[in-house]
């Protein structure tokens, strides 16, 4: 009975950890799919005869992906600062974390 409980708690913990990463992966995949279909639609309408049109298109698709990558990095940093790097925030509030203090003293 006790063994089943511990396995169950481990499963729920791993699900909680994996949930945000899977959500980011899905949103990123949806976004890349949207941009790819959008860019092919532009190519069909323009016919892509001139080189200027091609350059403009590549810049537009690059600008579409920029905010997503920035948002992704912000989400990862906010999640990691809450979970893994709590010792760094503890250092600011007066607590001490051995690995960080060693790196600073050197």
Swiss-Prot record:
Biased composition (Basic and acidic residues): 52-63
Keyword tags: Mitochondrion
GO cellular component, one term: mitochondrion
Stretch list, region Disordered: 33-64, 87-106
Polar residues bias spans: 87-99
Top-level division of the source organism's lineage: Eukaryota
Localisation per UniProt entry: Mitochondrion
More about this protein: A stretch of 270 kb of the mitochondrial genome is duplicated within the centromere of chromosome 2 resulting in the duplication of the gene. The expression of this duplicated gene is not demonstrated.
Record-given protein name: Uncharacterized mitochondrial protein AtMg00890
Organism, as annotated: Arabidopsis thaliana (Mouse-ear cress)
